[in-house]
Regions:
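N-terminal export and membrane-targeting signals
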Residues: 1-16
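C-terminal motif of bacterial Sec signal peptides marking the signal peptidase cleavage site
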Residues: 21-25
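Penicillin-recognizing serine hydrolase domain
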Residues: 27, 35-83, 92, 146-302
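Glycine/charged-rich beta-loop-alpha catalytic/anionic-binding loops adjacent to active sites
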Residues: 90-99, 122, 165-166
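Short alpha-helical patches at coil-to-helix transitions and adjacent helical residues
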Residues: 105-110, 135-138, 177-184
Length: 302
């Protein structure tokens, strides 16, 4: 049907263009110079191509959103959770379900570790904070950023702002807020973020206990965070990272997912997180093959 509508649009545009030319010929004794006519035709063709391209991109985005909705509904129904997903690619960003308004928990350790690497943090401390999600190591990195810059909160916020992925960073950093959409945007940027190389490598080497959801997928680096809300008693488990594709030029797509459920057990949320991650990965792989998702070349650059 998309090709039929495109053909109809092209036909209508050409008919209108032809009629306009015919009317112009009747009203004027002298026709337009041949060069002007060719130029006008070229401009009309370019404008029409732009309209068709925009319409195709919009249709791809709507179709992707609908498919994400179906993935989310299946996971929610089967596991009794609420879920959210964000995808960031060259072709655009899509966010469905939960927006990620809950605390960031340990996902915020990624930009903290990058900010710490920028001021010379010990790589073993970074490994502990990312690979094992060690809270004491993360606090040591935060303290070093505070000592070196005088404002750890501002340093981490500035880093995220630089890559158009802002968060509300709190001194009790686990309670920061960072939407899934912005996490996916930062994830897509990770391969090119200054001073992020060691952090990026650590995200591919998580301990077995944390190697689930996005982290368990092939060609994907991610960091998770989880915790119990003191406000509504709901347990949130969220992850963000980057999915890369191999080829002549590496390509990347930023991903962020979240499940929220009653209870307080990490293991209870894990099956839902795994199912959500696999569903999203399958969808993204197919959308890339179909051209509905166009990854960033190497990484997302601002």
């Amino acid at each position: 049907m998309k090709h039929v509508r495109s053909f109809q649009l092209i036909t209508s545009a050409l008919v209108i263009f032809g009629l306009s030319g015919a009317v112009g010929g009747c009203d004027n004794v002298q026709s337009a110079p041949e060069g002007d006519a060719q130029s006008q035709a070229a401009q009309s063709t370019e404008a029409l191509a732009g309209v068709l391209k925009d319409r195709s991109a919009e249709e791809d985005s709507l179709r992707l959103a609908g498919e994400l909705d179906r993935v989310i509904r299946r996971v929610e129904k089967r596991y009794g959770v609420e879920a959210g997903v964000a995808i960031d690619a060259q072709s655009g960003s899509v966010q469905r379900g939960l927006k990620g308004e809950e605390p960031t928990w340990s996902t915020i350790k990624v930009p903290i570790a990058i900010a710490a690497a920028e001021v010379g943090a010990d790589e073993q401390m970074i490994d502990l904070a990312i690979e094992q999600s060690d809270n004491d190591a993360a606090y040591a990195l935060w303290t070093q950023v505070q000592w070196e810059t005088g404002d750890a909160n501002g340093a981490v916020s500035d880093l995220l702002d630089e890559y158009d992925a802002p968060a509300k960073v709190e001194d009790s950093f686990g309670y920061s807020t960072w939407t899934l959409k912005n996490q996916a945007a930062f994830g897509a940027s990770l391969p090119c973020v200054a001073h992020a190389r060691h952090v990026y490598d650590a995200m591919a080497n998580l301990i077995v206990y944390h190697d689930n959801g996005l982290s368990a997928l092939p060609d994907t680096r991610a960091k998770g965070g989880w915790g119990l809300s003191e406000i509504d008693g709901m347990y949130a488990h969220r992850q963000f990272g980057v999915r890369t594709t191999k080829g002549a030029e590496p390509q990347s797509v930023g991903l962020a997912i979240e499940v929220v459920m009653p209870g307080d057990d990490f293991s209870d949320a894990e099956p839902a997180l795994n199912a959500l991650a696999k569903g999203v990965d399958k969808l993204v792989e197919q959308a890339i093959a179909d051209g509905a998702i166009k990854p960033y070349v190497a990484c997302r650059r601002i």
